[in-house]
């Protein structure tokens, strides 16, 4: 993950203001240490609740930055896919945590020693990596909302123009696409699109200007979308694609654990709300509570 996110450090753009709830973390650590659930086959709910809350906050922020309000069904799709991504992230996190339970002789470490060993690794999961994911969710949810507008306007503004990055230090890989104008349904947009690199700040604008030629790519292998970003979130509602390492290269049992957890705990299209004082979900039926039925409700 460090290699994947290496170039994503954001020193000039999105302000990723979040704090991972320590009460949730401490409950999760206690549960993992006491082996009250199986990290290979289950999803730790406190870690999930907090991760999903933060990714949802990023999505809210990104949508608020777009000039287009998305409809309820598309917002539900974003929320549901964010829940799936959060569950995969937590499966990776909880198994990384559990892998440090025993010393080199296979003996269970004392709880405080184990926590001391775990915290440097947790800094990656709940700080560095999550910050990159937060910033990316902000940018890509804004792009997703923009795409919804492009679809609605395509009878009047049928083409899209790739706009120059707003970054003070833009990467050279997208520069060849600046100024390209193509129809919204052109296959080019399936393989190249703003937001397919970590921390990309390029964008699209709808236009009735005539289409340009498809640009030649001198380095097609180098200009492939980054793993986890090789999709159009405005079409499928996934801010992180299925090629993300949490999903494509997860621990054994990750896909089955996530499938079971989502089916049991997450109503499609819901937003999860947690009472951190009690550590319990606010829905007494066994599934997480739907806290809104409208985008801004």
Regions from the PLM with identified roles:
Residues 38, 64, 106-107, 127, ...:
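Intrinsically disordered or highly flexible coil/loop and linker segments, enriched in small
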Residues 137-210:
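Conserved short secondary-structure elements within globular domains
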Residues 59-61, 120-125, 158-168:
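A broad, low-specificity signal for short, low-complexity segments enriched in glycine/proline
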Residues 1-122, 208-297:
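N-terminal leader/targeting and assembly helices and adjacent pre-domain segments
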Residues 103, 112-115, 119-136, 140-156:
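Internal glycine-rich, Lys/Arg-flanked active-site/core loops of soluble domains
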């Amino acid at each position: 993950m460090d290699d994947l996110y290496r170039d994503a450090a954001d020193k000039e753009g999105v302000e990723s203001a979040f704090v991972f709830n320590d009460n949730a973390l401490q409950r999760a650590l206690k549960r993992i240490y006491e082996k009250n659930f199986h990290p290979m086959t289950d999803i730790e709910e406190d870690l999930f609740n907090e991760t999903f809350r933060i990714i949802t906050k990023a999505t809210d922020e990104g949508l608020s930055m777009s000039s287009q309000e998305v409809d309820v069904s598309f917002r539900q799709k974003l929320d549901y896919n964010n829940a799936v991504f959060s569950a995969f992230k937590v499966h990776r996190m909880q198994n990384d945590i559990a892998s440090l339970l025993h010393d080199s002789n296979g003996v269970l470490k004392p709880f405080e020693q184990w926590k001391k060993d775990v915290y440097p690794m947790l800094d990656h999961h709940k700080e560095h990596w999550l910050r990159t994911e937060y910033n990316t969710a902000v940018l890509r949810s804004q792009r997703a909302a923009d795409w919804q507008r492009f679809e609605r306007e395509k009878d009047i503004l049928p083409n899209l123009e790739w706009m120059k990055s707003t970054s003070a230090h833009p990467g050279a890989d997208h520069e060849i696409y600046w100024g390209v104008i193509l129809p919204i349904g052109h296959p080019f947009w399936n393989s190249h699109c703003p937001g397919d690199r970590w921390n990309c700040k390029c964008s699209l604008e709808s236009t009735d200007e005539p289409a340009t030629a498809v640009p030649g790519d001198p380095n097609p292998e180098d200009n492939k979308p980054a793993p986890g970003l090789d999709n159009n979130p405005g079409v499928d509602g996934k801010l992180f694609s299925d090629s993300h390492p949490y999903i494509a290269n997860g621990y054994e049992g990750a896909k089955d654990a996530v499938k079971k957890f989502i089916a049991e705990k997450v109503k499609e299209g819901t937003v999860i709300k947690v009472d951190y004082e009690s550590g319990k979900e606010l829905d007494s039926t066994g599934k997480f509570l739907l806290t809104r039925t409208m985008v801004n409700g």
